[in-house]
A protein has these predicted regions:
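Charged, amphipathic alpha-helical coiled-coil/dimerization segments
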Residues: 68-123
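Alpha-helical linker/hinge and terminal dimerization helices associated
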Residues: 16-23, 56, 98, 102-117, ...
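C-terminal regulatory/oligomerization modules of transcriptional regulators
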Residues: 123, 127-177
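Hydrophobic/basic alpha-helical segments enriched in Actinobacteria
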Residues: 8-11, 15, 27-30, 42-48, ...
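N-terminal positioning helix adjacent to the helix-turn-helix/winged-helix DNA-binding module
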Residues: 5, 12, 32-34, 94, ...
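N-terminal leader segment of winged-helix/HTH proteins
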Residues: 1-28, 175
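N-terminal helix-turn-helix DNA-binding core of bacterial DNA-binding proteins
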Residues: 20-62, 143
């Protein structure tokens, strides 16, 4: 039987997912897959479809379709890759603008949710999230999937639990900011 804590965590996960999916976007970004792929192209510029496919956990055909939609919408451009057989993908100016807008909306929503906690509650939540994420990260591909929508700047600076686990490093401490 599910305990109350697990139930509440599931509800919070749905709240965050539903709010992210409800963010208005251009038609090409109507679904979470396209949004995740757009963000992955921004996080891993000049990467191949294969690298990005892993980051968003898609089959190769699904990744090709997602990229084609982003290219058609003028959000992503194809370039010649370092390996002439592969295509490198990068955000266009419009793609960068959309990625930034979606990231800002995500940041605001998460700040609103966490902002209802006092400092000591935030510290406890951060410690618990570090422990959960460090323990749940399975491998490098899973790490890319987990962090596919992250603003990785603040997390990497403090010691990202997902990145630490993926690299075989010890679980990081809570940041003391």
């Amino acid at each position: 039987m599910t305990q109350r804590t697990e139930n509440l965590l599931g509800v919070l996960a749905l709240l965050i997912t539903d709010e992210m999916n409800a963010q208005p976007a251009v038609e090409a970004l109507a679904g979470p897959t396209a949004r995740a792929m757009l963000n992955a192209v921004g996080q891993y510029p000049d990467s191949s479809i294969e690298v990005l496919r892993e980051a968003v956990d898609l089959s190769h055909p699904a990744a090709v379709r997602a990229v084609a939609g982003l290219v058609e919408a003028g959000l992503v451009e194809k370039r010649t890759g370092s390996d002439k057989r592969a295509v490198a993908l990068a955000l266009t100016v419009a793609g960068k603008r959309e990625a930034k807008r979606l990231q800002t909306a995500r940041d605001r929503m998460l700040q609103r949710v966490v902002g209802r906690l006092d400092d000591s509650e935030r510290e406890v939540l951060e410690s618990l999230l570090i422990k959960i994420l460090w323990n749940e990260t399975r491998d490098p591909a899973h790490a890319m999937q987990l962090c596919r929508l992250c603003d990785d700047g603040p997390c990497l600076k403090a010691g990202c639990p997902v990145e630490c686990r993926e690299q075989g490093l010890p679980m990081p401490e809570r940041s003391h900011s």
